């Protein structure tokens, strides 16, 4: 996620320099249950303003950044643990395993099971 800092497009609006780092840090620390309204409260910003600022700075919305974090962590866990796909789904913040499978396939182009089988590192 930190890679998004080099894609910042501040344009004519000026954002607090550390805002993006604060957002990304929050996602890193609260990926299981992080909520945009909680982040806004912590940082003291209006939800609509912060949503727009995140999109402008990264090209992605808050939910997309959160999903990227969750899915990349899930991929790491698939390759480096023996946890079940269902357990990994819950570990990264998805209560609905079917939804997790769908998002994983959309993001990586293959199912979690196929990902583990094709890219497996011996554990």
Regions found by a protein language model. Give the residues of each.
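AAA+ ATPase active-site-proximal loops
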Residues: 17
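Basic, amphipathic alpha-helical hairpins
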Residues: 1-12, 22-38, 53-54, 58, ...
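Basic/polar phosphate-binding segments, predominantly the helix-turn-helix DNA-binding elements
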Residues: 33, 37-69, 89-114
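Terminal helix-turn-helix DNA-binding modules in bacterial transcription factors
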Residues: 21-25, 29, 56-95, 117-123
């Amino acid at each position: 996620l930190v890679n998004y800092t080099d894609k910042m497009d501040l344009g004519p609006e000026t954002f607090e320099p550390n805002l993006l780092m604060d957002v990304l840090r929050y996602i890193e620390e609260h990926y299981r249950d992080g909520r945009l309204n909680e982040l806004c409260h912590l940082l003291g910003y209006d939800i609509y303003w912060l949503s727009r600022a995140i999109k402008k700075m990264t090209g992605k919305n808050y939910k997309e950044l959160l999903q990227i974090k969750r899915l990349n962590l899930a991929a790491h866990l698939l390759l480096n643990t023996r946890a079940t796909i269902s357990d990994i789904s819950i570990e990264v913040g998805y209560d609905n395993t079917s939804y997790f499978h769908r998002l994983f396939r959309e993001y990586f182009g293959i199912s979690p099971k196929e990902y583990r089988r094709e890219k497996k590192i011996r554990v």
